[in-house]
């Protein structure tokens, strides 16, 4: 009887030792930006993309607008939101940063600037999505205007820039 227990214990110890030798550990860094009062998400509930690629069309000598369907999530659907840009966005040529293309941003059909605009809660149509504190779909549109290049003529190359949107609850 003792021999059976000893052999069983040895078999289990060997099994666990083998499993431990083939294990691998993975670490995933997780980040979050939290504002418990208001957020701007894609209409499917996912975060806004970290980057978008604007498409230049030689046929029209300009960029196509990039549109993202968004929704406002809030903890107080009686209040609207104030939306603004932290800086005027431009696309700068990577090799010649003085060559810049102005970028326009529209939210809910209104042009954004560094001065905040207020969008009333009635215009956001909270609860129309079926969720009390989620707005109806609002379009966020980003467009670079190749007809207004500064620093020289538009040339082939890589251009990059930032669009930083600040969204706060109105008072």
Curated annotation (Swiss-Prot):
UniProt cross-references to Gene3D superfamilies, sorted A to Z: CFA/I fimbrial subunit E, pilin domain
Primary location class: other
Subcellular location: Fimbrium
Signal sequence, start to end: 1-23
Induction record: CS1 fimbriae are only expressed in the presence of the positive regulator rns.
This protein's record includes keyword Cell membrane: no
GO CC field: pilus
A Pfam family matched in the record: Fimbrial_CS1
Alphabetized InterPro entries for the sequence: Fimbrial_CS1-type
Tagged with keyword Endoplasmic reticulum: no
Keywords: Fimbrium, Plasmid, Signal
Functional description taken from the UniProt entry: Fimbriae (also called pili), polar filaments radiating from the surface of the bacterium to a length of 0.5-1.5 micrometers and numbering 100-300 per cell, enable bacteria to colonize the epithelium of specific host organs.
The family this protein is said to belong to: Belongs to the fimbrial CS1 protein family.
Listed name of the protein: CS1 fimbrial subunit A
């Amino acid at each position: 009887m003792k021999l059976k227990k000893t052999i069983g214990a040895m078999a289990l110890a060997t099994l666990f030792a083998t499993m431990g030798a083939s294990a691998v550990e993975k670490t995933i860094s997780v980040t979050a930006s939290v504002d418990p009062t208001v957020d701007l998400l894609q209409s499917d509930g996912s975060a806004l993309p970290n980057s978008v690629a604007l498409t230049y069309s030689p046929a029209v000598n300009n960029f196509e607008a990039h549109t993202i369907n968004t929704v406002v999530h809030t903890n107080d659907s009686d209040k609207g939101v104030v939306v603004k840009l932290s800086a005027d966005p431009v696309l700068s040529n990577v090799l010649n940063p003085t060559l810049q293309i102005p970028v326009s941003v529209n939210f809910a059909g209104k042009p954004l600037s560094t001065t905040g605009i207020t969008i009333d809660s009635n215009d956001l149509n909270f609860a129309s999505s079926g969720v009390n504190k989620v707005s109806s779909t609002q379009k966020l549109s980003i467009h670079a205007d190749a007809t207004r290049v500064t620093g020289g003529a538009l040339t082939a190359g890589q251009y990059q820039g930032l669009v930083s949107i600040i969204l706060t609850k109105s008072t």
